[in-house]
């Protein structure tokens, strides 16, 4: 267990959710995104802490026809001031917050 400056974190404890509509993503969660019914938007936290991590999975393998849009909520993604559109079938990736200059970075694919 460690303190990240805001909350106590327990390593190895992970939270999973299945989503099929637009949602506000929470730090430390893993999302199985089902876009069978149409594209969805995940809105990132507005004030994340350094090292905050969120993971997304294309559980239905439909991002190619119904994309996941990751709304940056004021912070850069990959250093860019644009939302991230993911349209690769079967995509799975994590975003980690690196600070206000470069914002959310793709940590793993």
Regions found by a protein language model. Give the residues of each.
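Short edge-strand/loop segments of extracellular domains
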Residues: 71-80
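Beta-strand-rich interaction surfaces with strong enrichment in secreted/lumenal proteins
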Residues: 81-86
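Exposed extracellular interaction/assembly regions and N-terminal maturation sites
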Residues: 7-71, 100-109
